[in-house]
Amino acid sequence: MNRAFVKQGLKIIKSKKNLGIKTLLDICKIETNPTIYHLGFMLGPRINAGGRVGKCSHGANLLLGKNPKSSFKLASELDQYNKERQILEKDLLQKILNETKDYSKDPVLILSGKNWHEGIIGIVAARLKDKFNKPVILISVEGDTGKASA
């Protein structure tokens, strides 16, 4: 079923009829027919980046928009948010790795930190899972509230 969705989605994207997708393809400098790689590593992260840094509606507005000027503005902002997300992700991952003791005997890693950006802790948890080959739960603590992602 997922393959069918991806195949159909690629057909739609290749047609370049959606102004937002077309604009994002231009911003990403994708000049060939988009592939699964482009979806997973270039387009998808940018569309999701707004939600990760607090601008939840940007991705949807880009995909639904009909105005070239506002589509370009949204695509440019999403591209910038994606760069910010990458920096936040890299910084948090490095911070955790620098502070992490030897967890080789622990079956699960459960780590928490004050004010870790909740939009990226899931991505960082996935990176740590790959590095340590075990389940990882990260908890961002703000005041007396914790938000977790695994």
Task: Kindly give the residue locations of the regions a language model identified.
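Hydrophobic helix-and-loop "lid/oligomerization" segment in the mid-to-C-terminal part
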Residues: M1-A150
